[in-house]
Regions:
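N-terminal export/targeting and maturation segments
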Residues: 1-84
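Extracytoplasmic electrostatic interaction patches
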Residues: 83-174
Length: 174
């Protein structure tokens, strides 16, 4: 049974500083669109033993290779923050417009998941300051998302506002 919206809002409020810190790190220190932590070993460069012995005079921080622009101290902090907020990963979507010299970053942090890829239910914390301006997005402030989905029991994606730019997302597919 997915957590209620009320329980997720309480959880967000309790850990709001950690959620905001995740956003700060991802928006200011990372590069590109990606999953963190990396989903496969191929996404991370690991030095072989020859290269490690060649750099043995360097400290661990000097040997650190950025992963999506994130240095080791940021990754360690992110690991700690994700553990605190109970989310196993962050999906980062970054869009850059050279003409406007601006960057748009949205985050999805899965909090609950049940089922398989093609059929299941998930609830996530989402940061997306432009969500309300998108077409075909269903946002509701009334009722629990779980109850709304149970009444229709169709494939659905619903959002509920939590704070400015922050939402709960319920995604269900059969």
């Amino acid at each position: 049974m997915p957590p209620s919206d009320e329980a997720m809002i309480r959880h967000f409020t309790t850990h709001e500083a950690a959620f905001r810190k995740v956003y700060e790190i991802m928006s200011e220190s990372s590069e590109g669109s990606f999953h963190y932590p990396p989903l496969s070993p191929e996404e991370v460069i690991i030095l072989d033993s020859t290269e490690q012995s060649d750099t043995s005079h360097e400290t661990n921080d000097e040997q650190d290779l950025p992963v999506y622009g994130l240095l080791k101290p940021d990754r360690l902090l992110l690991d700690s923050l994700l553990s605190e907020i109970g989310c196993g990963l962050v999906l980062v979507d970054r869009r850059e417009w050279e003409t406007a010299d601006s960057v748009y970053v949205s985050l999805v942090m899965p909090y609950y998941s049940h089922g398989i890829v093609d059929a299941g239910t998930s609830k996530s914390f989402v940061y997306d300051p432009g969500l309300e301006s998108r077409r075909n997005i269903r946002i509701t402030e009334h009722g629990d998302l779980n109850e709304i989905y149970r009444r229709t029991y169709n494939d659905t994606t619903l959002y509920k506002p939590v704070r400015e730019g922050w939402y709960i997302e319920l995604d269900h597919s059969r």
